[in-house]
Every structure is written in structure tokens, then in C-alpha cells.
Curated annotation (Swiss-Prot):
Source superkingdom: Eukaryota
Lineage summary: Eukaryota, Viridiplantae, Streptophyta, Embryophyta, Tracheophyta
Cofactor: [4Fe-4S] cluster
SUPFAM superfamilies: 4Fe-4S ferredoxins
GO cellular component: chloroplast thylakoid membrane; photosystem I
EC number: 1.97.1.12
Subunit structure: The eukaryotic PSI reaction center is composed of at least 11 subunits.
Protein's name according to its UniProt entry: Photosystem I iron-sulfur center
Keyword Iron: yes
Residue numbers binding [4Fe-4S] cluster 2: C21, C48, C51, C54
């Protein structure tokens, strides 16, 4: 079952989510929008197992990364904003 991984612009570039992911779905890429000059990216979502460890590791007040399981609808994804 496919999962959708969304990275939001509240990402502070701390790498906590990348280190927490057991399947290496996430990686850091260059980005000028934060102090760390990097942001999380999810280039391998097909490997996501839906464990949501990345969400648990995120230190921002509003989770900068969200995993939407295959059973969740596109509508519920839109409500996350």
C-alpha cells in the first residue's frame, strides 16, 4: 500500500526525521528557506512502511513532516494545513 510523505516549510533542517526513518525514505537536500540551509525530502516514498517515526522525531511545534497512510484520503491530507 502506497503512503504519501509531505514535508512542510516549517522544516528547520535538523535531520531528526532522516535519522529516525528505518527504511531510508528521507534525505536532506539544499534549501535556502531555513537557517540550516537544508530541508528534508522524501524521494523514496515507495519504501515507506507507515511507521511515522519521522513524525515522532520532528521537534517543530507543527509537525514539518507528515505520513499519510494509503487508506487516508486526499481530502484529509488537505486538512493538515
Amino acid at each position: 500500500m502506497a503512503h504519501s510523505v509531505r514535508i512542510y516549510d516549517t522544516c528547520i533542517g535538523c535531520t531528526q526525521c532522516v535519522r529516525a526513518c528505518p527504511t531510508d525514505v528521507l534525505e536532506m537536500i539544499p534549501w535556502d528557506g531555513c537557517k540550516a540551509n537544508q530541508i528534508a525530502s522524501a524521494p523514496r516514498t515507495e519504501d515507506c512502511v507507515g511507521c511515522k517515526r519521522c513524525e515522532s522525531a520532528c521537534p517543530t511545534d507543527f509537525l514539518s513532516i507528515r505520513v499519510y497512510l494509503g487508506s487516508e484520503t486526499t481530502r484529509s491530507m488537505g486538512l493538515a494545513y
